[in-house]
A protein has these predicted regions:
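Juxtamembrane interface elements at the cytosolic ends of transmembrane helices
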Residues: 5-7, 34-37, 173-180, 191, ...
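N-terminal signal-anchor module of multipass membrane proteins
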Residues: 1-74, 78-103
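Membrane-embedded alpha-helical modules
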Residues: 105-213, 327-440
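Short, non-helical or kinked segments that cap or interrupt transmembrane helices
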Residues: 46-51, 68-81, 135-144, 189-194, ...
């Protein structure tokens, strides 16, 4: 007689479900990450196939480093979009739409992403040596929150530019995402980006806004790596490389805080404290190495996905094996240029509509970071730190950043880089830093199925 499974208590061994159900659950997790993961390369000009490969390999690497204990999927990080838009901004096509990849500068951006992953490794080592509370003292929400807010605001103009190519498709995509997020139930609430793309794409088909020529020309099988796009071959010490480092590496300081929140969310969902076992040092190391690998191969930064945490909460299947099945499926899809060609037929207007709400939510997540941690803005110290960060980020970004020469090498700091440096220094210098790290902060919000950085 087969063992009866009590789903209400959660399933920690998916093998009890049988191979068929495990595969279906893996497909479900793949769809949960899919919309957000493929959106990043569409917004930056990176390869969709390379991105899927890096997401799959990064997830498997993360599971290996965390002793196969943490049921987390690593997909493309939205937080780094601001860095990509500064280092390798999309170029205009013949119609004035920002759809052309900046092939000259993308490898430098990817190389900087690879180095930003090393920041995670340093943080992992410091946490192992000094403990998490001492390290997080330097990166309180009054610093990381405004940085995240700035990222979304810097990206906002590009969303409007993309929407202008087809406002009908943009409004359909935007409206669908809003409806799914506010009124959706179950998987509908967890997959707002994917559903938004599908619904608006259907409208695009009806209105004749989709060009299928590239699909017929694409091969069914191909290698998802492109040497000319790899960050590995852009580590050359050039001014472009150095400037990219200063622009993108500071973003890692903010995404590390999101990582902590995501791991806390998974812990709350599953009922196991992953911050203690296998340890935050291991989860940071796994995320960091996955990001470094992705950058070297020409992909975007990886991050733990809140969408998949929502699937865990909905299905109550907590076995990390199911996540690894989704990772393998992502790798398989990455070897099909035909599939990438289909993704690349998504009209610019749809991308604009999705990014319209996405970029706003990046800033909103920064606000949430500040609110959940009860940052006191009646305290003039906190007001000064936040004010300096916001003005540095937006102000210097509007004038092209700050440039200076050191040892004959010209270095250009973006507004985000200046903001991060100024915020960290002010927080360290000004008296009254009473922040105490709480690993459980934000765990509820991260399981809600909303979009994640």
């Amino acid at each position: 007689m087969s063992e009866k499974i009590d789903y209400s208590k959660g399933v920690y061994d998916a093998k009890k479900l049988g191979t068929g159900r495990m595969f279906i659950l893996g497909v479900q997790h793949m769809f949960a990450m899919f919309g957000a993961t493929v959106l990043v390369p569409l917004l930056t000009g990176l390869s969709v196939s390379t991105t899927l490969l890096c997401a799959g390999l990064g997830t498997l690497l993360f599971h290996l480093i965390t002793k196969k204990k943490v049921p987390a999927f690593l997909g493309s990080s939205f937080a780094y979009l601001g860095g990509f838009s500064i280092v390798a901004p999309m170029l205009a096509d013949a119609d004035g739409n920002l759809t052309v990849a900046n092939t000259k500068m993308l490898p430098y951006a990817c190389a900087a992403v690879a180095f930003s992953g090393l920041v995670y490794l340093v943080a992992s080592l410091l946490i192992s040596t000094f403990g998490i509370r001492r390290i997080m003292k330097f990166f309180p929400p009054v610093v990381t929150g405004p940085i995240i807010i700035s990222i979304g605001l810097i990206l906002a103009p590009s969303a409007i530019t993309n929407c202008q190519s087809n406002w009908l498709l943009a409004f359909v995509a935007l409206g669908t995402v809003i409806v799914c997020n506010i009124w959706g139930k179950g998987m509908v609430k967890i997959l707002p980006i994917l559903i938004g793309v599908l619904v608006s794409y259907a409208v695009a088909l009806v209105t004749g806004a989709v060009d299928f020529q590239k699909i017929s020309e694409a091969a069914w099988l191909g290698i998802p790596l492109h040497k000319e796009a790899m960050g590995l071959f852009a580590i050359d010490g050039s001014p472009e490389f150095i400037s990219a480092l200063f622009t993108i590496i500071p973003i890692a300081l903010a995404t590390m805080m999101e990582h902590v929140g995501d791991i806390a969310a998974i812990s709350a969902t599953v009922g196991h404290n992953y911050i203690n076992d296998p340890g935050l040092n291991r989860t940071l190391m796994g995320d960091g190495l996955a990001t470094t690998m992705a950058g070297l191969l020409g992909g975007p930064a990886n991050t733990t996905y809140g969408e998949n945490t929502g699937v865990l909460a909905l299905s109550k299947i907590y076995d990390p094996l199911v996540i690894r099945i989704a990772a393998v499926l992502a790798i398989i899809l990455s070897f099909s240029p035909k599939f990438e060609a289909v993704i690349n037929t998504i009209p610019t207007g749809i991308i604009g509509g999705i990014s319209f709400v996405l970029y706003g939510m990046i800033s909103a997540i920064g606000v949430r970071n500040v609110v959940e941690n009860r940052v006191d803005f009646t305290n003039s110290r906190n007001l000064i730190v936040a004010a300096v960060i916001l003005v540095c980020a937006l102000g210097f970004n509007s004038v092209g950043g700050v440039g200076f020469t050191v040892g004959g090498v010209t270095i250009n700091l973006s507004g985000l880089a200046v903001a991060a440096i100024a915020g960290i220094l002010l927080n360290a210098i000004l008296p009254g830093n009473d922040y105490e790290f709480d690993a459980t902060a934000g765990s509820d919000a991260a399981t809600s199925g909303n979009l994640q950085v």
